[in-house]
Amino acid sequence: DPSMTQPVMYSLIDRIPSTRAVYIRGLVGRGQLTEDEARQSIAQYEAELGRILEETRAGGASSVSEINPGSRTHDPALTAGVGEAGESPDEEWTMPESQMPGIGMMIGWTSAAPAKQLRRIGRAHTRFPEGFEPHPKLRQLCERRLEMALGNKPIDWGFAELLAFGTLLMEGTSVRLSGEDVARATFVQRHAVLHDADDGREFTPLRFLTENQARFDVWNSPLSEYGVLAFDYGYSLESPETLTIWEAQFGDFANGAQTVIDEFVCSAEQKWGQRSSLVMLLPHGYEGQGPDHSSARIERYLQLAAQDNMWIVQPSTPANYFHMLRTQAYKRPRKPLIAFTPKQLLRLSAAASHIDEFTSGSFQPVIGDTTITDPSAVTRVLLCTGRLYYDLAKERERRGDTSTAIIRLEQLYPLPEAEVAEALAQYPNASVTWVQD
């Protein structure tokens, strides 16, 4: 009891309403909840905790593995006698869908999207509310996005992301995006929220796709990586059907939330059987702004990767980024996604994708070299990740080099060994060199 040594300070603290009380007061004040509903929610939550405690005691659990939700349905001894009389194990305890140990995707689902959905998203960017006047540059951007959706222009990184969000929303999957300057994006490529040039009012095109679409939230967060990532991790657990995304202003800044990453993102499943599909977008690239604005510290996340605890990706094309986001929304079992996103590629014409890559195909963990016409003539294979590919390809073209193939490793963990082996097998006469980012 700290009041024994600091009575005055803790007397003051005791008079301050708790965080929960302040939060409830805010919800009630905004009309989002009544006081009775708040009390009922608290009572239900506490009752659930009590039930789980009694269930654990009755089962005689003594280790994390014994109380892991993923193992309970496979071990009748742990559930026998826990529920009410006459109930079977399946009736007495229902595992939340978000914590199911199954693998794979939703049956019949693919990450490709129909062209008509893409066109709808494009049109939504040019149908402004009456009297709404966007900045002239943003009007031009929205018109380009419509042309991209119609297949008349290659699709860039910013619009590929909005296409992923929009198609998910139309399918009924909510999307939450938070971070510093995420509405516009640090590198000014997203513009998920548009502003009237005269009065500043906001318009979010992805909220006006269909009448019954899911919820799309975009929040410019406070400058606290620790607090915001912790909140979003919890949000991903409480709203598992939502694609919850946290974006660092620069990937380097995630070190301010390292405790959350260590204690929850990379290890909660192993410790508590707690599954999350949280997405961390970490801008990475040495074309940044010097120290602490260049490296998302890829090596740090690879050191934390083990026992299939995360999905670590560095996509190099808008289309693969699109498929990555849509795959994450439905991938089972749920795993956190660490995605290293580019800077230069956001506006690099060579990195744009054709609309056909969005209406067909899937996420590619490895991208082979489609420019090679004679694999037997290749004497060297360069294996790389991310934007580095475009630098290498440009230099190869400058030299007129036809003996070097470049393979992109898009998925860093789990390492796609079979796909890497298949890509390398095409070049039996070549040595392999890893090109470090």
Please tell me what each predicted stretch does.
Residues 1-436:
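Flexible, glycine-rich loop/tail regions that form catalytic "lids" or insertion modules at the edges
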